């Protein structure tokens, strides 16, 4: 059976999180803060919506791409991982080798929760296999997912035409 080929893209997006801020000498309160970033799209649909819960709720996790709170070096390593290339920081990927697609919007910590996939790269295709939520401190159990586990397949040339320029912009400037 032939796998459907999806088209990877990107779109600017913003997630709003309540963060604690100092509002006086001793007083703190939670205030909404916008976290702009570049979201993956699959066939024109934001990845967060592709993996939305049955209620329609979407996760607060984001990509670190074009995210002012993510260090450029981390953004570059994240994109290397998405391309299936070696990373400089081992904490960029899960300890089981899975690649994070979406990470915590406030600190990018893989132990908060991350949407991950087994990345398979062949001559012609890239596959995000068994997309699932996981934390790095526990083994992944696909049977315990709260929503169906899906896989996505992309044409490698089209995929790299989206991802590689993002990496080059970070490493060549």
Predicted regions span which residues?
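Intrinsically disordered, low-complexity acidic regions enriched in Pro/Ser/Thr
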Residues: 1-173
């Amino acid at each position: 059976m032939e796998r459907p080929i999806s088209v990877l893209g990107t779109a600017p997006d913003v997630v709003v999180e309540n963060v604690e801020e100092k509002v006086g000498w001793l007083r703190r309160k939670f205030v909404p803060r916008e976290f702009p970033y570049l979201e993956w799209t699959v066939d024109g649909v934001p990845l967060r919506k592709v993996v939305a819960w049955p209620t329609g709720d979407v996760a607060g996790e984001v990509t670190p791409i074009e995210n002012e709170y993510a260090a450029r070096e981390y953004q570059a390593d994240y994109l290397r991982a998405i391309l299936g290339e070696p990373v400089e920081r081992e904490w960029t990927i899960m300890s089981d080798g899975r690649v994070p697609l979406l990470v915590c919007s406030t600190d990018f910590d893989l132990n908060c929760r991350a949407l991950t996939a087994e990345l398979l790269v062949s001559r012609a295709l890239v596959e995000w296999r068994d997309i699932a939520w996981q934390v790095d401190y526990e083994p992944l159990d696909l049977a315990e997912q709260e929503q169906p586990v899906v896989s996505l397949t992309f044409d490698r040339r089209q995929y790299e035409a989206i991802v590689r320029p993002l990496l080059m912009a970070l490493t060549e400037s």
